[in-house]
A protein has these predicted regions:
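FMN-binding flavodoxin-like domain, especially the glycine-rich phosphate-binding loop
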Residues: 7, 12-19, 24, 28, ...
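Extreme N-terminal starter segment of soluble prokaryotic enzymes
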Residues: 1-4
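A short, well-structured beta->alpha microelement
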Residues: 26-41
C-alpha cells in the first residue's frame, strides 16, 4: 500500500511536518511518496492521501495547494476509492484556525472520498514541537488503514 503524503505550506511548517511523518511511515515499512504542492495528475490515482496543510490568509489553503483543490472541486471525478486524513497547522488567535482542514475535508467528501480518522489540528501557539505532536497522532491514521 502506498501512502501519498501531500503538503501545502506558506512558511514551511507544514512541509517539515509532512517530511517527518513520511520518514516515520518509512521506518514502519510503509511505501510512501512525498509531494509538496503536487500537480493533481501526480496524485489523483493514488488511494491513500495524508494531507498536511497550513491555513493561509483568511482561512485559505496555501498557494501551492489551493489550485489542486479548486481542480478537484471543478472536476466530475469520483474519488470514492480515495481514503484520506488531514493534519493542519494554524494559529488559534485567528477565527479561521485550521480552516484549511475543513476545506480539504469538505471538498474531498463532496467527491465521495472517505476520511478514515479524525483530523489533527495543531495550534502553533501552544505546540512547540509540531513534528512530534503529529507523530503522536500518526497511530490513529495507521490503525485506520
Amino acid at each position: 500500500m502506498n501512502i501519498c503524503v501531500i503538503s501545502g505550506s506558506t512558511l514551511g511548517g507544514a512541509e517539515y511536518v509532512a517530511e517527518h511523518l513520511e520518514e516515520v511511515l518509512k521506518t514502519q515499512d510503509f511505501s510512501t511518496a512525498l509531494f509538496h504542492g503536487p500537480e493533481l495528475d501526480d496524485v489523483i490515482d493514488e488511494n491513500i492521501w495524508l494531507i498536511v496543510t497550513s491555513t493561509h490568509g483568511a482561512g485559505e489553503l496555501p498557494d501551492n495547494l489551493k489550485p489542486r483543490f479548486e481542480q478537484i472541486a471543478a472536476s466530475d471525478k469520483d474519488l470514492s476509492s480515495l481514503r484520506f486524513a488531514v493534519v493542519g497547522l494554524g494559529n488559534s488567535d485567528y477565527d479561521t484556525f485550521c480552516h484549511a482542514v475543513n476545506k480539504v475535508e469538505t471538498q474531498l467528501s463532496e467527491k465521495s472520498a472517505v476520511k478514515i480518522c479524525e483530523s489533527l489540528k495543531i495550534d502553533v501557539l501552544h505546540v512547540d514541537d509540531q513534528e512530534q505532536f503529529a507523530e503522536d497522532w500518526l497511530p490513529q491514521f495507521i490503525h485506520a488503514l
